[in-house]
Amino acid sequence: MAGRLPACVVDCGTGYTKLGYAGNTEPQFIIPSCIAIKESAKVGDQAQRRVMKGVDDLDFFIGDEAIEKPTYATKWPIRHGIVEDWDLMERFMEQVIFKYLRAEPEDHYFLLTEPPLNTPENREYTAEIMFESFNVPGLYIAVQAVLALAASWTSRQVGERTLTGTVIDSGDGVTHVIPVAEGYVIGSCIKHIPIAGRDITYFIQQLLRDREVGIPPEQSLETAKAVKERYSYVCPDLVKEFNKYDTDGSKWIKQYTGVNAISKKEFSIDVGYERFLGPEIFFHPEFANPDFTQPISEVVDEVIQNCPIDVRRPLYKNIVLSGGSTMFRDFGRRLQRDLKRTVDARLKLSEELSGGRLKPKPIDVQVITHHMQRYAVWFGGSMLASTPEFYQVCHTKKDYEEIGPSICRHNPVFGVMS
């Protein structure tokens, strides 16, 4: 362990990739998960359209640089948390390692993350890229939910370190509710909710478009995103909240000033109801999506009820938030309140059905918020990859050469013992 360079931790999400070295509290880089490549206008599948003439192979950009390149085709290789284009992913990782982390991949162990329900084949592809193309000495593919649980240990609410709990991971592209027991994901009970950061942005954009005329169309999405990130919060009661704004508007309505990218003129808008209506679609999804109407608290309840009976109490007791879209003020408090109501109503019903003979033991519902929520997965990875055990559970280059990529199908759980 002594004299060894720290492991690299890379958490690739739909919207952003978080990267840095183990042992740090926050990622060194947070870059958009996109890549800009040169493409010819030929008809055909992706592979044929790409211009690959030796030198052009190196002619690409990732992250913020990619977004600023109008003459290149910008691609997002990850959708809904899962890698769709491996060819681009390999080139993306190339710049992540050499240009951003400035690391020699042969000297660092790597911890990469995977979404829930990732296929074993995807783990093999990842292993092939890391061992064959980058020649890394060791690789561990961690499940995002388990890392998010580990990150929640920093919270004061958590008494003992446990890897049992329900993780609500809400990023830009997808929200998952994932039950974890003793570090293993209960795969059959995972549910995903088709509402995430991007949908909130679109919803706010729609509200602003209906109400504010002064927003230049090309700035519309950016404005909505800024409003979401700066001013939005979760309210306890919609009707009361509307009343607050109607009776004492000056106190609640905020001003947002943006700059038109083309004419460079400033424009300013009032931000009113959008502040609380945006995140409200987690609790009333029908506002934005007529096909999906189940509030997040009911989804969480259903997930836990589907789990084996002996882990249900600990799952209610340790509900952990992770990802950028759980950062809204009072999100955890509102979720805890709604969930407690559902659970208490069920207990009351069972008591009534038994004719008052059975007194069910109350269930402790606890939603844990902590400072590391936004980059919880990355931070959990950084914590676990800086323990000596990490190097024992990693798959090494030697194992890979002896057995092949199938070794990465299984990654042993660790970190509970520490």
UniProtKB/Swiss-Prot annotation:
UniProt keyword Cell cycle, yes or no: no
Expression sites by tissue: Detected in brain and kidney glomeruli (at protein level). Detected in kidney, lung and spleen.
N6-acetyllysine modification, residue list: 240, 244, 251, 254
Subcellular localization: Cytoplasm, Cytoskeleton; Cell projection; Nucleus
Short name of any one Pfam family annotated for the protein: Actin
Assembly: Component of the Arp2/3 complex composed of ACTR2/ARP2, ACTR3/ARP3, ARPC1B/p41-ARC, ARPC2/p34-ARC, ARPC3/p21-ARC, ARPC4/p20-ARC and ARPC5/p16-ARC. Interacts with WHDC1. Interacts weakly with MEFV. Interacts with AVIL.
Protein name: Actin-related protein 3
Originating organism: Rattus norvegicus (Rat)
